UniProtKB/Swiss-Prot annotation:
One of its GO terms (cellular component) is cytosol. L-glutamine binds at residues 354, 382-385, 405, 462. Residues 292-534 form the Glutamine amidotransferase type-1 domain. CTPSs have evolved a hybrid strategy for distinguishing between UTP and CTP. The overlapping regions of the product feedback inhibitory and substrate sites recognize a common feature in both compounds, the triphosphate moiety. To differentiate isosteric substrate and product pyrimidine rings, an additional pocket far from the expected kinase/ligase catalytic site, specifically recognizes the cytosine and ribose portions of the product inhibitor. This is CTP synthase. GO terms for biological process: 'de novo' CTP biosynthetic process; pyrimidine nucleobase biosynthetic process. The active site is at 381 (nucleophile), 507, 509. Keywords: ATP-binding, Glutamine amidotransferase, Ligase, Magnesium, Metal-binding, Nucleotide-binding, Pyrimidine biosynthesis. Pathway: Pyrimidine metabolism; CTP biosynthesis via de novo pathway; CTP from UDP: step 2/2. ATP binds at residues 14-19, 71. Residues 1-267 are annotated as: Amidoligase domain. Allosterically activated by GTP, when glutamine is the substrate; GTP has no effect on the reaction when ammonia is the substrate. The allosteric effector GTP functions by stabilizing the protein conformation that binds the tetrahedral intermediate(s) formed during glutamine hydrolysis. Inhibited by the product CTP, via allosteric rather than competitive inhibition. Catalyzes the ATP-dependent amination of UTP to CTP with either L-glutamine or ammonia as the source of nitrogen. Regulates intracellular CTP levels through interactions with the four ribonucleotide triphosphates.
């Protein structure tokens, strides 16, 4: 039978519950315990698929096509496992399921209430994860902050859960903030005391306190928290601010988080095999070259909108013993006159995914700048579509080449709606979503990077390259380097005569890992590093001559 850890958060939002859950998953997995992590989100949307990135950050897509919270990306990257739609639960999906059951008569005419019907549905979703993969430990993060009205049904459900499955099979872990007050020159525990008091009023006594803080918790403060919150002092864990999220697992290991969790669950201690993770951190902390990469997007004011892209770039940089400096460029600011000012001097340009016409012209201009100036370029999803539009307009000389998404009556719709999307009315969960196979051209750069003929990548789109233009694009120098196995859908394009110009219809960033950088991001960063070294060499030669 699986054991269960519930991670709640107090005092403020965005405190790092997801990173704590992911880090605990890493530490337990390093001890050869199997782990699955799920997120309970208190918003009433069925999923985040139709939410603005400014509201929610990126939408993370799983192998089975679920549109989920970005925390699932952290879970997958830290534990190196593939999750599914079972690992993402929202209030909206719970109420939808309950109401569907009511319409079918499943409640036998009874009055449908939050307790027991909604709470039972929540508990069933948690148990479903345990039944699906039978992990040793299921870690559940409850979104929001203790005290929020939206989270109450989830908190009530996990309160009941310990009674249902047994006291020794459940751990309640509360992540809280210990603020540093500069004027007083001390850290304050009162917000945490009140947060725990709020949690107790719901009927949950935390077993472990994970204290987010700017400075290490001194023994006296740990003892104070232990006394006022009724938590053993060894279960008061310091989660000090770190320069990288990938340092957090090792920091929490030093604090004994995994050991305390296993003791509370009556599971035996095991030696943690963290050598690979320790090597990763050593590489991060002693980088060589610094590479400047421009991300040209629509939502650059909120970095979380492109979180997996940023992490995939970091993974590739770590593997190359380098570090990256990001130049965030709003696509709306890029035009013929400003492209040079925004993009000059960068070592590589990434145009990530997105939806809608706003900023598209700027993305197209940035792609032209990368192509003409031989700057390594990686386009993702809409980034591929924009690169096709750019080539159609500027090289193939197609009048008003465009996507039918942006211009319905364009005479040259080089990007068109997928046929199966023609009759789709609802927006949520109706795109081409999830893991699909892609067959690579053996004579392509993509093939040399992946090292295999058939690959699998995650998708999230409605539009594709219009095959009516495939021959023309090939004749003018474009290479289709990856397609669906039947050859119908173009999945990867590249420019053979460019230092590195690859664009994909899929989202490779979702399958990158800290210890296994994605091949396309690795290839892109290698090209960026090579370009920088060549520029440095050329600059040195000029200096020597002068």
């Amino acid at each position: 039978m699986s054991k269960f850890v519930f991670v709640t958060g107090g005092v403020v939002s965005s405190i790092g519950k997801g990173i704590v859950a992911a880090s605990l998953g890493r530490l337990l997995k390093s001890r050869d315990y199997s782990v699955s992590i799920l997120k309970l989100d208190p918003y009433i949307n069925v999923d985040p698929g139709t939410m603005s990135p400014f509201q929610h950050g990126e939408v993370f897509v799983t192998d089975d096509g679920a549109e989920t919270d970005l925390d699932l990306g952290h879970y997958e990257r830290f534990t190196d496992t593939e999750l599914s739609r079972l690992n993402s639960v929202t209030t909206g999906s719970i109420y939808q399921a309950v109401l569907n059951k009511e319409r079918r008569g499943a409640y036998m005419g009874g009055t449908v209430q939050v307790i027991p019907h909604v709470t039972n549905e929540i508990k069933e979703r948690i148990l479903r994860v345990a039944k699906d993969t039978n992990p040793d430990i299921v870690i559940t993060e409850i979104g929001g902050t203790v005290g929020d009205i939206e989270s109450l049904p989830f908190l009530e459900a996990i309160r009941q859960f310990r009674k249902d499955v047994g006291r020794n099979n459940v751990v309640y872990m509360h992540v809280t903030l210990i603020p540093w007050i500069p004027a007083a020159k001390e850290m304050k525990t009162k917000p945490t005391q009140h947060s725990v008091k709020e949690l107790r009023s719901i009927g949950i006594q935390p077993d472990v306190l994970v204290c987010r803080c700017h400075l290490p918790l001194q023994p006296g403060l740990k003892e104070k928290l232990s006394a006022f919150c009724d938590v053993p002092v060894e279960s008061v864990i310091t989660a000090q601010d770190a320069s990288s999220i990938y340092e957090v697992p090792l920091n929490l290991e030093k604090e004994g988080l995994a050991q305390q969790t296993l003791e509370l669950l009556n599971l035996g201690p095991r030696y943690p095999h963290l050598e690979e993770w320790e090597n990763l951190i050593r590489q991060m902390q002693s980088p060589g070259q610094k590479l400047e990469i421009a991300i040209v997007g629509k939502y650059v004011q909120l970095g979380d909108a492109y979180l997996s892209v940023v992490e995939a770039l970091k993974h590739a940089a770590i593997a190359l013993n380098s570090e990256i400096e990001l130049r965030w460029v709003s696509a709306e600011d890029v035009d013929n006159d400003s492209a040079e000012a925004h993009l000059s001097g960068v070592d590589g340009i990434v145009v990530p995914g997105g939806f809608g016409i706003r900023g598209v012209d700027g993305k197209i201009k940035a792609i032209e700048y990368a192509r003409v100036n031989n700057i390594p370029f990686l386009g993702l999803c809409l980034g591929m579509q924009c690169s096709i539009i750019e080539w159609g307009r500027n090289v193939a000389r197609l009048e008003r080449a465009n996507s039918s998404e942006f211009e319905e009556d364009t005479p040259n719709p080089v990007i068109n709606l997928l046929p199966e999307q023609a009759d789709v009315v609802d927006l949520g969960g109706t795109m081409r979503l999830g893991l699909y196979p892609c067959r690579l051209n053996p004579d392509s750069l993509a093939f040399s990077l992946y090292g295999q003929e058939v690959i699998y990548e995650r998708h999230r789109h409605r539009y594709e390259f219009n095959n009516a233009y495939r021959s023309l694009f090939f004749e003018t120098g474009y290479l289709v380097s990856g397609t669906s196995p039947d050859g119908r859908l173009v999945e990867i394009i590249e420019l053979p005569k460019h230092p590195f110009f690859i664009a994909t219809q899929f989202h490779p960033e979702f399958r990158s890992r800290p210890n296994k950088a994605h091949p396309l991001f690795s290839g892109f960063m290698k090209a960026a590093l090579k370009g920088r070294e060549e520029k440095f060499s050329l600059s040195s030669q000029h200096s020597a001559v002068s």
